[in-house]
């Protein structure tokens, strides 16, 4: 894959130098090269991150999280947005997120406090529990323009899947996620409040309307995430 991307990159440089004006074909080549790079990195990382926790133990350990993430419609106090749905999320991504909160790489005082005392096994167990939930039975209603969002989502498909149900375990499933949470996440990547080189680069050129449309599209997709319901 690295060789393929390298050859394509050399061809692109030669053709682009002969015609300084960017064309639709050039843009398509850039997109393909970027996705090849992302998929190559993802394959390596995914092979090193395999969650293997105990869902039953995770259910008990999730009790502290349930006060926010097991209440349908619950919102963050400030700024106000719905807390993310976690049921059905990739286990490996849950672990990545918890470690980022624990280390302070993702900024959220409550999440940092809750993740701070977790050990590796705790994270594995919580992740296994959350990933065990079945997908939503029906799509959620949204407010934005899902048709426009679908068109704009092509650049997201390499990591997150065309419908937000991607299979690369270290990247989050987006299908069925809270619409306003997705807007908040994209805005934070764009501003640098959340630091991820790939997402920062992808979000940087988005307009407010792009963010609204993308959030609406992924939030509306079937077989999506669910709010955890504890017995």
Predicted regions and their residues:
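His/Cys-centered metal/cofactor-coordination and adjacent catalytic loops
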Residues: 74, 78, 130-140, 175
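C-terminal capping alpha-helices of c-type cytochrome domains
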Residues: 116-138, 189, 204-231
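Short, Lys/Arg-enriched N-terminal segments with co-localized hydrophobic residues
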Residues: 10-27
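Gly/Gly-Pro-rich "capping" loops immediately C-terminal to redox-active cysteine motifs
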Residues: 55, 59, 72-102, 112-117, ...
């Amino acid at each position: 894959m690295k060789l393929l991307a390298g050859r394509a990159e050399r061809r692109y440089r030669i053709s682009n130098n002969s015609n300084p004006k960017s064309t639709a074909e050039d843009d398509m080549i850039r997109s393909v090269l970027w996705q090849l790079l992302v998929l190559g990195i993802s394959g390596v990382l995914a092979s090193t991150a395999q969650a293997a926790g105990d869902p039953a133990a995770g259910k008990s350990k999730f009790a502290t999280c349930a006060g926010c993430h097991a209440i349908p419609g619950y919102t963050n106090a400030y700024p106000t947005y719905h807390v993310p749905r976690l049921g059905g999320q990739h286990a490996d991504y849950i672990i990545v997120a918890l470690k980022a909160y624990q280390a302070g790489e993702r900024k959220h005082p409550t999440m940092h406090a809750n993740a701070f005392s977790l050990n590796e096994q705790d994270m594995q167990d919580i992740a296994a529990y959350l990933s065990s939930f079945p997908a939503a039975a029906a799509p959620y209603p949204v407010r934005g323009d899902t048709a426009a969002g679908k068109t704009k989502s092509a650049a997201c498909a390499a990591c997150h899947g065309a419908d937000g149900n991607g299979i690369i375990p270290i990247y989050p499933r987006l299908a069925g996620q809270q619409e306003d949470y997705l807007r908040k996440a994209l805005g934070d990547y764009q501003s640098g409040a959340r630091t991820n080189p790939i997402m920062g680069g992808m979000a940087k050129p988005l307009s407010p309307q792009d963010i609204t449309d993308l959030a609406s599209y992924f939030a509306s997709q079937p077989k999506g995430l669910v709010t955890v319901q504890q017995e």
